[in-house]
């Protein structure tokens, strides 16, 4: 089954949310306290997704706010360099800084992130800075969960969703749950459920859907889709790590995609690369089952490399991994 989208739009995908800096440890297999060297990359889930999408050949744009500093200029320059439209990337004029994420790679199984997110520019995007004429030029609007964690970014995202719905732009909600961004799980559940119920496509891990539903124990996919299909969503993708991912349609179809074998260097970046390749396949008319394969293959490639944004693969790399058909089979 394919997913129907408008064909008369200039952009395939526009994302709204955070763009920040990732500083990834160059020295592997050691704790942060002993790490001396880091490499700088563009980070932030929605930024990574549009970068990955653009590298795959989609026409992608970005709505967000960056700091008026060296890091902000690096973000804008890098995004432009890979083909992302930055005409709606606003430069902060109130002294807010770029968010920083330092990553620690103790082992493939033990990676952590140290975040600096106090008064960051991306959370100060205001509703007045969201342009309806820009949104209506796209097939999809991608919303990231972290952008809902604080005002005025929260209201800017809610406005963008309203404008998308008014202009027949499909809304994709990438849950992107970061607990350090929120006051309480209950607050997260309120805003996640509000946005999920208005979205057309919802993508996240099983654990992120549990947060959306305010569960304290692992939830059930069938219960999740019963709840969400009472509202706007037409397609729900639930990721289960090495067990693969599952896609469900409101029409009743269900699909499973398996994870691909790879040599894991680190665990972060998988979700963003998954989303960019999954959406690429959907937009290209390849069908939902094939889109699951593209998402899984892209994630497997990125976790084997040092960065997230810079490691986003090409179509040829993804298709080569799919062709090898070396999947992880877990019942």
UniProtKB/Swiss-Prot annotation:
Task: Give me any GO biological process, just one.
Answer: inositol catabolic process
One GO molecular function term of this record is: 5-dehydro-2-deoxygluconokinase activity
Task: Describe which pathway this protein belongs to, using the record's wording.
Answer: Polyol metabolism; myo-inositol degradation into acetyl-CoA; acetyl-CoA from myo-inositol: step 5/7
Q: What is its EC number?
A: 2.7.1.92
Give one Pfam family, short name only. PfkB
CDD domains tied to this protein: KdgK
Which InterPro entries does the record cross-reference, listed alphabetically? Carboh/pur_kinase_PfkB_CS, DKG_kinase_firmi, Myo_inos_IolC, Myo_inos_IolC-like_sf, PfkB_Carbo_kinase, PfkB_dom, Ribokinase-like
Keyword Transferase present in the record's keywords: the answer is: yes
Quickly give the catalysed reaction: 5-dehydro-2-deoxy-D-gluconate + ATP = 6-phospho-5-dehydro-2-deoxy-D-gluconate + ADP + H(+)
Keyword terms of this UniProt record: ATP-binding, Kinase, Nucleotide-binding, Transferase
Q: Which residues form a coiled coil?
A: none
Main role? Catalyzes the phosphorylation of 5-dehydro-2-deoxy-D-gluconate (2-deoxy-5-keto-D-gluconate or DKG) to 6-phospho-5-dehydro-2-deoxy-D-gluconate (DKGP).
Q: Which NCBIfam families match?
A: myo_inos_iolC_N
Q: Which PANTHER family match?
A: 5-DEHYDRO-2-DEOXYGLUCONOKINASE (PTHR43085:SF49), HEXOKINASE FAMILY MEMBER (PTHR43085)
Please report which protein family the annotation says this sequence is part of. Answer: Belongs to the carbohydrate kinase PfkB family.
The identity of this protein, by name, is: 5-dehydro-2-deoxygluconokinase
Q: What is the lineage of its organism?
A: Bacteria, Bacillati, Bacillota, Bacilli, Bacillales
Q: Which gene encodes it?
A: iolC
């Amino acid at each position: 089954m394919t997913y129907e989208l408008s064909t008369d739009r200039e952009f395939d995908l526009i994302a709204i949310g955070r763009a920040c800096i990732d500083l990834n440890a160059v020295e592997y297999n050691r704790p942060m306290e002993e790490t001396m060297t880091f490499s700088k990359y563009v980070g932030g889930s929605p930024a990574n997704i549009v970068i990955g999408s653009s590298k795959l050949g989609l026409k992608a744009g970005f709505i967000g706010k960056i700091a008026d500093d060296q890091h902000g200029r690096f973000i804008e320059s890098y995004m432009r360099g890979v083909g992302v439209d930055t005409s709606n990337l606003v430069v902060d004029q109130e002294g807010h800084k770029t968010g920083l994420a330092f990553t620690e790679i103790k082992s493939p199984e033990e990676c952590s992130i140290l975040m600096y997110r106090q008064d960051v520019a991306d959370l100060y995007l205001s509703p007045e800075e969201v342009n309806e004429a820009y949104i209506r030029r796209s097939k999809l609007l991608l919303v990231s969960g972290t952008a809902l964690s604080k005002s005025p970014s929260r209201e800017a995202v809610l406005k963008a969703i309203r404008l998308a719905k008014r202009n027949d732009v499909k809304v994709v909600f990438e849950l992107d749950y970061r607990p350090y961004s929120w006051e309480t799980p209950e607050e997260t559940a309120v805003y996640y459920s509000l946005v999920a119920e208005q979205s057309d496509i919802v993508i996240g891990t099983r654990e992120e859907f549990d947060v959306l539903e305010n569960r304290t124990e692992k939830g059930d996919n069938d219960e999740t889709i019963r709840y969400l299909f009472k509202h706007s969503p037409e397609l729900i993708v639930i990721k289960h790590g090495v067990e693969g991912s599952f896609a469900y349609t409101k029409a009743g179809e269900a699909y499973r995609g398996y994870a691909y074998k790879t040599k894991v260097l680190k665990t972060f970046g998988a979700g963003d690369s998954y989303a960019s390749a999954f959406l690429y396949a959907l937009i290209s008319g390849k069908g939902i089952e094939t889109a699951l394969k593209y998402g899984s293959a892209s994630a497997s490639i990125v976790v084997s490399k040092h960065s997230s944004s810079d490691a986003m693969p090409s179509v040829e790399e993804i298709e080569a991994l799919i062709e090898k058909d070396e999947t992880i089979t877990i019942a």
